[in-house]
Amino acid sequence: MNEGRAAEQDVLVRQGRIERIDPSISPPSPTCEIIDASGKLILPGLIDDQVHFREPGLTQKACIRTESRAAVAGGVTSFFEMPNVSPPTLDMDRLEEKCAIAARNSLANYAFFLGASNENAEVVKAADPAKIAGVKIFMGSSTGNMLVDEEEVLEKIFRFAPTPIATHCEHTPTILENERLAREQFGDEVPFSEHPVIRSREACLRSSSLAVELAKRENARLHVLHVTTAEELDLFTPDHERITAEACVHHLWFEDSSYESLGSLIKCNPAIKKASDREAIRQGVTDGRISVLATDHAPHTWLEKQGTYFNAPSGLPLVQHSLLLMLEMVQEGCFPIETVVERACHAPARIFDVRERGFIREGYWADLVIVDPENQTMVDETELFSQCNWSPFSGTRFSHSVDLTLVSGQVAYSGGEPTDGQTGMRVEFESQRR
């Protein structure tokens, strides 16, 4: 399944790359390894453009090794990791340190966002576009407290950023006022069902609208992350190449009634909102106003998530089951599988100018996932690879399973287990990306 069509084809991989695609290929040598994918789906490996793998500084929650194991188990072959670690990734030295950690430990291909702050606009301006996934701006306060709220700084970053800008869009003053009102009503025992009231649709729309306005004014490339409301979709068009939007799988799957059973486990920023928002976002995925499907994988320990509303951190582990979630939505008729491949594989590669990944093409790196449509997956906590060792999908049965994952031509996941060792490579980007 690739570039809008399905075909029964053999794929020859040599030295990590796809050498040939043909309806019938004879083994080039007696020692050639043959992987029989009869009756199964071969997809490009997913490129997840938003994950939090917590290293360095937050490794009590997760690390690049464990979360990359979960990634390849879920068919994710490349990830772009966010800068809100400790210390935050606010300069190229910190970013290169993270690359060095990933080079030793990651099973998946890796790239890292350079974080923006109120103080580092010149660092952002001088960044090498070939070495970073993009520039991340927290236009709303979230985990890690990297808020950029000075208008002059925002304008400068949008004017000079050498890459696409990825934004977390929530209006912090609105959220703080909603928190004050919630405390007045509930005291410290705020129910988790109030989360979408506190981190409200108005907060999202106000911030996303500002980001789009800045991008148009400064002719910047903007990618708005984790859109959660129907109203925000009106900011985007299917044919706009410079202003794009992402939706995350949990916002496509859960809705506000889910807080009753899952509570803190699905507390995330921005919040999961109404069923009508979920349906609107699914429609946006179909019609192209949503360009990218991703996870915002953000693990915390089980103990941390047991806190009260103001103490339990926002975020949940998703990367191991994101493809299965997308395929479940295909099964339910939300959108076709071709759309999943476009939004989760092809579009991230195009939007972020990724070199030679994201497609099943001759000459490209062999990042491939084999999916078995006849073998179901029951989410069992004994079979989770994220370090936090819990999932909001525990006990869920998915209709597909990930059979095998290749990363740069090497088997990274097979037989229900990630491989030992390191298979990931640093993702390469084009040098002109403004």
For the regions a protein language model found, what residue spans apply to each?
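A glycine-rich helix N-cap at a beta->alpha junction
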Residues: 100-116
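Histidine/acidic residue-rich metal-binding segments in metalloenzymes
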Residues: 122-293
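C-terminal cap of metal-dependent C-N hydrolases
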Residues: 308, 362-428
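N-terminal metal-binding scaffold of metallo-dependent hydrolase/deaminase domains
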Residues: 1-29
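Metal-associated gating/positioning segment near the N- to mid-region
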Residues: 40-105
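His/Asp/Glu-enriched, well-ordered alpha-helical/loop segment
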Residues: 189-210, 214-219, 265, 286-293, ...
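Active-site metal-binding motif and surrounding structural segment of the metallo-beta-lactamase
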Residues: 25-42
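Divalent metal-coordination and catalytic microenvironments
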Residues: 16, 39, 50, 71, ...
